[in-house]
Amino acid sequence: LILMQLKSKPLEIRPALTGANWRGLWTLYAKEVHRYVKIFGQTLLAPIITTLLFLTVFAVAFGGGRTVNGLPYVEFLAPGLLMMTILQNSFANTSTSLIQQKLNENIVDTLMPPLSAMELTIGFVFSGATRGLMVSIGVGASLALIVPVHIHSTAAIVFFAVGAALMMGSLGMMTGIWAEKFDHVSTITNFIILPLSFLSGTFFPITRF
């Protein structure tokens, strides 16, 4: 009798979730930001020191009154180093986070919550972009103590900085999804990211090509 009642009872189909899971998205974003903030010496402070070393070495080697497009070489170099910092750190954050979770076999903890593919993408990309921008603020403040600052367009600075951070965060996420081990991430970094960074006009004008 119970079986007959169960069979005769129509199945109830729960409606699909609609709208964005804002709380889940914020939780993922906050988790990723907390992941690199708690080791700020490695993820935030070290890139600032590295950038200042680049500035020091190239200023000593190619400074000495040399100008590029009418600017002292150090003033030409500083914005390029700032943008290079944004690109490299935004890429490194998302790619490293995903490959670590895959190798530690705890990526299921990220995939199981009720987050759509778009929400996962936004969470990872924006957290990577945040790291790139946080490092750039530290680098910019440090460079401002050494190099004269001439801001011609705040809107252009914000547009290109945020756009570059989001672009490289997206590329880092694609790399993290594709990679199966750290060697794969290193391959993309060493053969694509670094060459593009060094040949992008950071250290010399692109008119030299």
Over which residues does each language-model region extend?
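Hydrophobic transmembrane alpha-helices and immediately adjacent juxtamembrane helices
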Residues: 1-209
